[in-house]
């Protein structure tokens, strides 16, 4: 489950990476797209993301029945579930998960909930840092957490050379974090351009590697993007 209160920080991209890593090792994966404003995860056909309407039609009221149905599947089906979440539904979904004891129910069902949190660099650093602090403080110990540091918009480390992991914010929640995964900033005219092209086409890394739409060197760059991310993900999936 990918959570962040700010839009445009890479939540959907991260959800797609988690799904691809699981699919690559042959796991059964079910993707849920709960973002009512942007169906970005559904824009990647290979992931077969299913829409989950968090809100009642023409309303800001939560559709509890839809959430309960999603949770029922997560508790009873033998699969890995990847849930993408939009900024507008961040608060109500988080409230549902915490107040209704969903993490505890997942553990009782013999499974585990892993919450993937995003801290983005540049101008997004303060707000996403607060979001990380809020979720880490609210969610029960039964929910594991993975922290993603997204450097696409700028550095997440301090100007003094101190890493994000050395900050008081991270240290206060360190005991909750299974792993820290870094999305390094890509050169915009090479690696970044090839990745953007792949995402615009709605392809997975595997599909791009087989596609005739990409030059050989572009495929090589995409492999160089994917491999270190996949290697960081493997221990926590």
Residue ranges and their predicted role:
Residues 9-10:
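Conserved glycine(s) of the Walker
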Residues 5-6:
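P-loop (Walker A) phosphate-binding loop of NTP-binding proteins
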Residues 193-237:
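NTP-binding/hydrolysis catalytic cores, primarily Walker-type P-loop NTPases
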Residues 17-18:
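Hydrophobic residues on the short alpha-helix immediately C-terminal to a glycine-rich phosphate/catalytic loop
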């Amino acid at each position: 489950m990918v959570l962040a209160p700010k839009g445009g920080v890479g939540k959907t991209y991260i959800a797609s990476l988690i799904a691809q890593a699981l699919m690559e090792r042959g796991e059964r994966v079910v993707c849920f797209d709960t973002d009512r404003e942007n169906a970005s995860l559904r824009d990647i056909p290979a992931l077969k993301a299913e829409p989950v309407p968090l809100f009642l039609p023409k309303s800001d009221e939560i559709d509890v029945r839809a959430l309960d149905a999603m949770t029922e599947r997560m508790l009873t089906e033998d699969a890995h579930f990847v849930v993408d979440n939009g900024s507008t539904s961040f608060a109500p979904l988080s409230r549902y998960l915490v107040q209704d004891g969903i993490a505890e129910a997942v553990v009782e069902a013999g499974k585990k909930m892993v919450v993937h949190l995003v801290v983005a660099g540049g101008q997004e650093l303060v707000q996403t840092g607060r979001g990380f602090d809020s979720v880490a403080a609210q969610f029960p110990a039964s929910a594991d957490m993975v922290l993603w540091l997204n450097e696409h918009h700028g550095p997440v480390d301090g100007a003094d050379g101190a890493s994000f992991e050395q900050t008081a914010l991270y240290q206060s929640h360190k005991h909750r974090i299974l792993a820290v995964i870094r999305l390094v900033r890509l050169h915009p005219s090479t690696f970044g351009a090839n990745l953007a092209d792949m995402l615009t086409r709605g392809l997975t890394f595997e599909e791009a590697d087989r596609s005739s739409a990409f030059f050989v060197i572009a495929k090589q760059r995409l492999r160089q993007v994917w491999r270190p991310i996949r290697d960081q993900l493997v221990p926590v999936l």
